[in-house]
Amino acid sequence: MSILLTTILLTLLTTPTLAQFGFFDQMFGGNGGQQQQQGHHHHHEQQEAQNVRSDSSWYQSQYEGAQCTHYLCPGTLSCVHFPHHCPCAWEAVEDKVELGDGIAICGSKGGWVAGEFEKKVEMARKGLL
C-alpha cells in the first residue's frame, strides 16, 4: 500500500512542475517540447518568421523608400497634400482632431460616445481639464 501512496504523491507533485515547464517553454520560444521530438533536421527545413528590428533603421528605410510628391505622414507613411490631412494610424479605435495651424492629433476613442475625444480636447485647450 505504501508503494501505491508514494506513486500517487509523486504524480501529484510532478504534474504541476511539468505544466510549468511547458508554460515557460512556450513563453520563451519553444514549441512545447515538440522541437526535441521532431529532431534538429526538421527544424532547419522550416524557416521561422523573425521579429521586426528594435532600432529605428527599419522604419527609416521604409520612410526613405516611400514615394510621395506631397507630404509623407511620419506615423502612417500616407501621402497627403497637407500635414493635418494625415490619417490616424488606427482609425477604427482613434479619432482625429485638428488643432489649427496645420496640426492634428489622434486619440483613443476609449469607449466614449461619438465626438467625446474632440470635446475633451476643447476642454483641455480651455484649461478646464
Swiss-Prot record:
Q: Which residues form a coiled coil?
A: none
Q: Which InterPro entries match?
A: LCL2 (IPR034543)
An example GO biological process term is:
ERAD pathway
Provide this UniProt record's keywords sorted from A to Z: Signal
Leader peptide range in chain numbering: 1-19
User: For the region Disordered, what residue ranges are annotated?
Assistant: 32-51
Q: What family, per the record?
A: Belongs to the LCL2 family.
* The protein's role, per its UniProt record: Probable component of the endoplasmic reticulum-associated degradation (ERAD) pathway.
The protein's name? Long chronological lifespan protein 2
